[in-house]
């Protein structure tokens, strides 16, 4: 018997003018047909408020990864890059963890990283990342905003606007947007 999962979302993160911001929508979808929640929080502050982490994918899987990542942050005393690499190694090498269907974006005051279950830890050249069903729309909007209006907008404003664009296009992304800043 096939069991549907709770999933689909958009997470966008940007480093801009010395600040960091991460935005996520609030929609949780069950399977491909039913919106179960409109106001979910998919972004968390970790390690004494010094790290932001956002997830896209299956909710239960993402919570498992949040807990693991938080443990790695504690183990490596807040070293974001080391914690991310160690999580990715464990995620990829463990038979059970390898089946988790989620992705994470994590950031601190200096780094922005994508962590995937295939073992990738990627730091973007342009300081912008987006994941999830509306990720490509948010990424395009964020890049355009940073390139053409960046000197007039804050990181928080760009993150909010990029998610709004994604919510207008993607059926799995809503406009109940939560933005966190560092």
Swiss-Prot record:
Role of this protein: Protease subunit of a proteasome-like degradation complex believed to be a general protein degrading machinery.
Subcellular location: Cytoplasm
Family to which this protein belongs: Belongs to the peptidase T1B family. HslV subfamily.
Class of this enzyme: hydrolase
Signal peptide: none
Subunit structure: A double ring-shaped homohexamer of HslV is capped on each side by a ring-shaped HslU homohexamer. The assembly of the HslU/HslV complex is dependent on binding of ATP.
Chain sites annotated for binding Na(+): 167, 170, 173
Entry EC number(s): 3.4.25.2
Name of the protein in question: ATP-dependent protease subunit HslV
GO-annotated molecular function: metal ion binding; threonine-type endopeptidase activity
Source organism superkingdom: Bacteria
Catalytic activity: ATP-dependent cleavage of peptide bonds with broad specificity
Description of how activity is regulated: Allosterically activated by HslU binding.
Keyword Cytoplasm: yes
InterPro entries reported in the protein's UniProt record: ATP-dep_Prtase_HsIV_su (IPR022281), Ntn_hydrolases_N (IPR029055), Proteasome_sua/b (IPR001353), Proteasome_suB-type (IPR023333)
GO CC annotations, alphabetized: HslUV protease complex; proteasome core complex
Active site: 9
Keyword Membrane appears in the UniProt entry: no
């Amino acid at each position: 018997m096939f069991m549907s999962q709770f999933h689909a979302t958009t997470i966008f993160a940007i480093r801009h003018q010395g600040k960091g911001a991460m935005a996520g929508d609030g929609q949780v979808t069950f399977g491909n047909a039913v919106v179960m929640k409109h106001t979910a929080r998919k972004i968390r502050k970790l390690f004494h408020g010094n790290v932001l982490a956002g997830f896209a994918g299956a909710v239960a899987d993402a919570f498992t990864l949040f807990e693991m990542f938080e443990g790695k942050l504690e183990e490596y005393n807040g070293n974001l890059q080391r914690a991310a690499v160690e999580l990715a190694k464990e995620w990829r090498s463990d038979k059970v963890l390898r089946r988790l269907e989620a992705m994470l974006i994590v950031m601190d005051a200096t780094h922005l990283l994508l962590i995937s279950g295939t073992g990738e830890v990627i730091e973007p050249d342009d300081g912008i990342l987006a994941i999830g069903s509306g990720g490509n729309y948010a990424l395009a909007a964020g890049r355009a905003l940073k390139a053409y209006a960046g000197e007039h907008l804050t990181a928080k404003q760009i993150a909010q606007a990029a998610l709004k664009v994604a919510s207008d296009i993607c059926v799995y992304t809503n406009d109940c947007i939560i933005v966190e800043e560092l």
